[in-house]
């Protein structure tokens, strides 16, 4: 809730600060892209790496933290959810990752096993009287696996660098001066890239257009 210039300056300063180990966004939102010209990514890249946690519009930083600063980020729940009385396992896993709890060093690669969930929330129970409710897990998770264009029912295993975020933000970044995806892909071609994508406001056809645009932009 400040000017883009001040927000970009504050984010850079807080990332460089020695008085915190992690930055957790208070929530998603709109127009975080406007602060990017005022974030000093050279200073971000030179700073001691730290976790940045957030989702949705926070893609504007979590994704660029990966592709520009070569630093891992956490695409996940924002600060408000941690006020939940009884934490869902997803919150426990997230907090453990931030603290390094349960992590193992496997030949220089830090590993942490996290849990999936069989259900998901369609409608939140959040309101003014209850700003941090339990997740309203009413919907069953359905996973469908494809190899190329063909659906399959066999086990699939793959590995690589996991990058992505909110497609609304990613397609907005495509082709801008902040788009360093080609360089990132080339740098880590031997590792392989695993994309995770979610959509906020895009309808089915907008999603297809976004996928087409990102694919043809490299």
Region spans (language model):
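N-terminal glycine-rich "phosphate-gripper" loop used for MgATP/nucleotide binding
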Residues: 24-33, 38, 55
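Feature captures the catalytic cores and cofactor-binding loops of soluble hydro-lyases/lyases
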Residues: 33, 41, 213-218
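Oxyanion-binding "anion nests"
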Residues: 162-209
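Conserved anion/nucleotide-ligand pocket segment
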Residues: 72-168
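ATP/NTP phosphate-donor binding region
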Residues: 1-19
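Structural motif
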Residues: 22-24, 53, 194-196
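Short, acidic/small-residue loops that bind anionic groups at enzyme active sites
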Residues: 39-64, 72-80
């Amino acid at each position: 809730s400040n000017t883009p210039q001040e927000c970009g300056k504050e984010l850079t300063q807080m990332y460089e600060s020695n008085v915190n180990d992690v930055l957790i966004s208070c929530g998603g939102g709109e127009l975080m892209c406007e602060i990017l010209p005022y974030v000093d990514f050279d200073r971000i890249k030179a700073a001691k790496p730290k976790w940045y946690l957030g989702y949705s519009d926070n893609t504007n930083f979590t994704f660029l933290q990966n592709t520009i600063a070569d630093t891992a980020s956490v695409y996940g729940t924002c600060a408000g959810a941690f006020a939940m009385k009884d934490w869902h396992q997803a919150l426990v896993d997230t907090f453990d990752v931030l603290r390094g709890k349960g992590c193992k060093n496997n030949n220089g690669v830090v590993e942490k096993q996290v849990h999936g969930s069989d259900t998901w929330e369609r409608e939140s129970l959040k309101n003014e009287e209850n700003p941090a409710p339990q997740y309203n897990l009413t919907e069953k998770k359905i996973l469908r696996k494809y190899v190329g264009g063909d659906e399959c029912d066999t086990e699939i295993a793959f590995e690589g660098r996991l990058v992505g975020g909110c497609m609304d933000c990613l397609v907005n970044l495509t082709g801008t001066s902040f788009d360093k995806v080609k360089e990132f892909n080339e740098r880590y071609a031997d590792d392989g890239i695993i994309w995770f994508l979610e959509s906020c406001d895009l309808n089915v056809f907008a999603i297809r257009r976004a996928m087409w645009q990102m694919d043809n932009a490299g």
